[in-house]
Amino acid sequence: MTNESILESYSGVTPERKKSRMPAKLDWWQSATGLFLGLFMIGHMFFVSTILLGDNVMLWVTKKFELDFIFEGGKPIVVSFLAAFVFAVFIAHAFLAMRKFPINYRQYLTFKTHKDLMRHGDTTLWWIQAMTGFAMFFLGSVHLYIMMTQPQTIGPVSSSFRMVSEWMWPLYLVLLFAVELHGSVGLYRLAVKWGWFDGETPDKTRANLKKLKTLMSAFLIVLGLLTFGAYVKKGLEQTDPNIDYKYFDYKRTHHR
């Protein structure tokens, strides 16, 4: 470790007596990774909800992710690489966000007192985002690891099997609320922080963005619950012990 690094770590300024730009750079990367994950969250919800349109529609979309228009039957390993990339961004975002978390009881008490006294909506939203982010770090990691290591088990039949027979439904139910709340709040706070849509009336814009955030949360949660119900219903109907439901979708597209 150089003397310059030691000086900056204690004083917060560079050897040139300038305030360190590192916090700003880390904030930018936190925002960038958060934006990517927020948009991915929306796309992911629309993907998994294709089961509401029928098995064939979801299977068709699944195979497009596996590049079946290039490889006959598709290559599940393509999904593994995609999941690994998202997992890496997910971990990086969590690492960057942890800088803002209260790290001891005193900091937690200070924040809680501030939140309760101020009763400011955006402060409460930050707290919701922090709590849902904490839950997502564990629940989301489980889901992403499964997608990364078992991509051939994605599909209307196989995913329903995982949901019910492999008892993933409690995790997915909690993850649904955590992801949709965290993502919608995060996108709202990004827009406010960077002033993307401020225009000439920032206060009015912020109020409209908050309404949009609420509508987004409600829409995605309702869509998610309908999708969740569809998977559970299909999973409960899988009662034939002679059928390999876990790899059913993979086998019917790779063994003809």
From Swiss-Prot:
* Functional summary from the UniProt entry: The fumarate reductase enzyme complex is required for fumarate respiration using formate or sulfide as electron donor. This subunit anchors the complex in the membrane and binds a diheme cytochrome b.
Q: Spell out the molecular function terms from Gene Ontology.
A: metal ion binding
Q: What's noted on cofactor binding?
A: Binds 2 heme b molecules per subunit, called the proximal (bP) and distal (bD) hemes.
Family, per the entry?
Answer: Belongs to the diheme cytochrome b FrdC family.
Spans through the membrane: 31-52, 77-98, 125-149, 166-188, 207-230
Needed cofactors, names only, are: heme b
This chain's source organism reads Wolinella succinogenes (strain ATCC 29543 / DSM 1740 / CCUG 13145 / JCM 31913 / LMG 7466 / NCTC 11488 / FDC 602W)
Where is it mainly found? membrane
Encoding gene, per UniProt annotation: frdC
**For binding heme b bD, which residues are annotated in this chain's numbering?**
44, 143
What subunit structure does UniProt give? Answer: Part of an enzyme complex containing three subunits: a flavoprotein (frdA), an iron-sulfur protein (frdB), and diheme cytochrome b (frdC).
Q: How does it sit in the membrane?
A: Multi-pass membrane protein
What's a GO biological-process term for it? Answer: tricarboxylic acid cycle
Which residues are listed for heme b bP binding in this entry?
Answer: 93, 182
Q: Which GO terms describe its cellular component?
A: plasma membrane
The record's Pfam families line, in alphabetical order, gives:
Sdh_cyt
Q: Protein name, please? A: Fumarate reductase cytochrome b subunit
User: Which InterPro entries would you find in this protein's record?
Assistant: Fum_red_B_TM (IPR004224), SQR/QFR_C/D (IPR034804), SuccDH_FuR_B_TM-su (IPR000701)
The region annotated as signal peptide is none
Per UniProt, the keywords (alphabetical) are: Cell inner membrane, Cell membrane, Electron transport, Heme, Iron, Membrane, Metal-binding, Respiratory chain, Transmembrane, Transmembrane helix, Transport, Tricarboxylic acid cycle
Residues in compartment: Periplasmic:
53-76, 150-165, 231-256
What subcellular compartments does it reside in? Cell inner membrane
> What residue ranges lie in the Cytoplasmic compartment?
1-30, 99-124, 189-206
Checking SUPFAM superfamilies in the record gives:
Fumarate reductase respiratory complex transmembrane subunits
